[in-house]
From Swiss-Prot:
Residues bearing attached sugar chains per UniProt: 2, 11, 15, 28
Lipidation (S-palmitoyl cysteine): 311-312
Annotated protein name in UniProt: Melanocortin receptor 5
Family listed: Belongs to the G-protein coupled receptor 1 family.
Ranges of the Cytoplasmic topological domain: 62-73, 139-155, 212-239, 298-325
Tissue: Skin, adrenal gland, skeletal muscle, bone marrow, spleen, thymus, gonads, uterus and brain.
BP-aspect Gene Ontology terms: adenylate cyclase-activating G protein-coupled receptor signaling pathway
Taxonomic placement: Eukaryota, Metazoa, Chordata, Craniata, Vertebrata
Cited Pfam families: 7tm_1
Transmembrane segments: 38-61, 74-97, 115-138, 156-179, 187-211, 240-265, 274-297
Natural source organism: Mus musculus (Mouse)
Domain of life: Eukaryota
Length: 325
């Protein structure tokens, strides 16, 4: 948000023309591209689907003791971050509907505060997602290259402390975002954080997969080699690769929008790109919808627990039968 903003995420979803730090900030859009409009119902539908899916993920992790491991705890943290995006967008959509239909009449100053909260929730969500993905990456790295010592290095207590630190840091970032919403340096800091964590994760992946093949050959000769554990570890690494790839695809346009908004807000071509901001919000919400599908696709245990919760909650005997398939 800058000094000229009156409404950011709210106005963007309504296709309004005010400027904002998370908004389109396109003053020359009439010379380039008209702002892309997306129905409010699309935002609400994706938000509700994402909310239900990620509640299901968290419920599965809580319900199934076989999922009580550091990796799935970090997956739960990622699900909470995804759920935060869906909640903020659903709340935003309801607020827009109430304002448009005059069911809610509030002062512009209070609307600005609501906007700040929405922006802060997006900030918290993206930082929490990045930190959770980084934690999963480190966990998979330890699992693959320190398999025999994994349970001594990554305990449930340590993973809990890591998650607590992640969310303390993310909430602090959100508070700073609200306090200094008029400063562009907050956005620069967010962009820098995104690319820094992305660099660390990609570097870790390159290192991990370059060494993985030689490492597998070396430990295969060991009498203590556990092929099942190794396959499980590699499967977890592939799952994380999919999560990271989807995260990059869905969030990169949003951060490119922020970069262009700061560097060339008056440029016609930059303005044209920024006119599609609503689509970038949709991509962010799609990320939170796709992640649970990846969990279900890659984890048989997660699929079984989903089936128990969705199809036969409260009917334990049929659930056990279904779990056998």
């Amino acid at each position: 948000m800058n000094s000229s903003s009156t409404l950011t995420v709210l106005n963007l979803t309504l296709n309004a023309s005010e400027d904002g730090i998370l908004g389109s900030n396109v003053k020359n859009k009439s010379l380039a591209c008209e702002e892309m409009g997306i129905a409010v119902e699309v935002f609400l539908t994706l938000g509700l689907v994402s909310l239900l899916e990620n509640i299901l993920v968290i419920g599965a992790i809580v319900k199934n003791k076989n999922l009580h491991s550091p990796m799935y705890f970090f997956v739960g943290s990622l699900a909470v971050a995804d759920m935060l995006v869906s909640m903020s967008n659903a709340w935003e959509t309801v607020t827009i509907y109430l304002l448009n239909n005059k069911h809610l009449v509030i002062a512009d100053t209070f609307v600005r505060h609501i906007d700040n909260v929405f922006d802060s929730m997006i900030c918290i969500s993206v930082v929490a997602s990045m930190c959770s993905l980084l934690a999963i990456a480190v966990d998979r790295y330890i699992t693959i290259f320190y398999a025999l010592r994994y349970h001594h290095i990554m305990t449930a207590r340590r993973s809990g402390v890591i998650i607590a630190c992640i969310w303390t840091f993310c909430i602090s970032c959100g508070i700073v975002f609200i306090i200094y919403y008029e400063s562009k340096y907050v956005i620069i800091c967010l962009i820098s954080m995104f690319f820094t964590m992305l660099f660390f994760m990609v570097s870790l992946y390159i290192h991990m997969f370059l060494l993985a093949r030689n490492h597998v050959k070396r430990i295969a000769a060991s009498p203590r080699y556990n092929s099942v554990r190794q396959r499980t570890s590699m499967k977890g690494a592939i799952t994380l690769t999919m999560l990271l790839g989807i995260f990059i695809v869905c969030w990169s346009p949003f951060f490119l929008h922020l970069i262009l908004m700061i560097s060339c807000p008056q440029n016609v071509y930059c303005s044209c790109f920024m006119s599609y901001f609503n689509m970038y919000l949709i991509l962010i919400m799609c990320n939170s919808v796709i992640d649970p599908l990846i969990y279900a696709l890659r984890s048989q245990e997660m699929r079984r627990t989903f089936k128990e919760i969705v199809c036969c909650h409260g009917f334990r005997r049929p659930c056990r039968l279904l779990g056998g398939y």
